[in-house]
Amino acid sequence: MANKKKPSIKKSVNEPNPHLKQSHASGSQQSLGDSLIEYNQPESSIPVCYIQNYPQFSDSYLYEPPFILSKVNEEVGHTVVHFLCTGNYETLRTASEPGASKIGIEFRRSMLVYQAAKEYDLYDLETYAKKYIEVFGESMSIFDIMEAAREIYSKLPKDEIWLTGYIYKQLEIAFSLDRNIFQRVDFYDGVGKDPNFDKDVMRMVVNIYSEVLSRQLDETTPEGSIAEDGAAEDCAAEDGAVEDGVVEEGAVEEGAVEEGAVEDGAVKDGAVEDGAVENGVAEECGAAEDVADDGALKEAVNLGIPSQPSGTALSFEWDHWTSGSKMGASFSGNSQWKYEKDTNSLYPENKAEESGGFNAAYEGIKSKKKKDKKKKKSNKDKKVEELAEPVPECGR
């Protein structure tokens, strides 16, 4: 369907085509065939009653036709419109890009849907997008996550905080698995494309390093202080013993004056013994300090970095479903996808070289862990509550 051009609205070359179109009749007079939103991927429209379920598409917008959804990327235009009609999340089958994994494509789409949902205050769609970002992000490297996030980061509202927190969490996880992750060449791919994104990521990296250093100080300082305090008390006790020896030595000297030179020899021997005691005290104090220093060194070396986890095989299953939208045919039926966490690869059961997409409310998606031959863990189905209430049908 060709869109009508209007002089007051400018469109860029790659701008998506979805737009709102005003109907001359009121909502109660319009039939199901009348449309307020149209888009051409594929050619279809949205009945009026569905639009009326969303307050953000108020009359103030409808009286200024056409309302162009310019913030919706054309790759997820179908997903947004399908959500408006059914309340569910759906992506279409498309040819895979060379070198791109199937699950990587769906992760990027989830990012694009999140950006569109934030722009037009579609809370339920935003909830879907967040969940799929987290699900598909489990198999993505930090480099792929940053690449997808960089594409939408500066397009989000200024008060957006969820994606920033998600990126920070993924950076922390990546650093805990590899202390040299921030020094790798791949980490700096794409730097300069979005200065705002680069600045925030740099701030996150500095915060992560600062937290690690602070944690080291908190863990090492109290133990070192306790060791030093204990050694100081021991030294003080020994000093007290020496002082007592000095007092006794004074008494011996007085006795030596009265009794004779023989006792002077005894006093001298006592003085030698006192010197030996003092040397022993010094050696004990030095040993205590060495033990404290060794403990601090071991604590400083140990950053508490966990070992790299072994690869985990997960499977996603979509049960039978049919498209409830009026958008035309889309990918449907039985499909089972499997990806390996270590290889970031997604394998559709039909082995087709395309991204199959999926259609289901989130409750229909199950995540399973396969049995491990060594550990023999039992399979557990993930039960996830429904994220969005179904949109009521027209006329009800």
Swiss-Prot record:
> Source species, please?
Aspergillus fumigatus (strain ATCC MYA-4609 / CBS 101355 / FGSC A1100 / Af293) (Neosartorya fumigata)
Q: Which domain of life is it from?
A: Eukaryota
Q: Does the keyword Methyltransferase apply?
A: no
- What Gene Ontology biological process does one annotation of this record name? cell adhesion
Q: What is this protein called?
A: Subtelomeric hrmA-associated cluster protein AFUA_5G14930
Region annotated Disordered, chain positions: 1-32, 347-396
| Annotated Basic residues bias | 367-380
Q: What is this protein's function?
A: Part of the subtelomeric hrmA-associated cluster (HAC) containing genes that alter the hyphal surface (such as reduced total chitin or increased beta-glucan exposure) and perturb inter-hyphal interactions within the developing biofilms, resulting in a loss of vertically aligned polarized growing filaments. Consequently, this hypoxia-typic morphotype (called H-MORPH) with altered biofilm architecture leads to increased hypoxia fitness, increased host inflammation, rapid disease progression, and mortality in a murine model of invasive aspergillosis.
Which key words are in the record? Answer: Cell adhesion, Virulence
Is Kinase included in the keywords of this UniProt record? no
Induction entry? Expression is regulated by the hypoxia responsive morphology factor A (hrmA).
Q: Where is the composition biased (Polar residues)?
A: 23-32
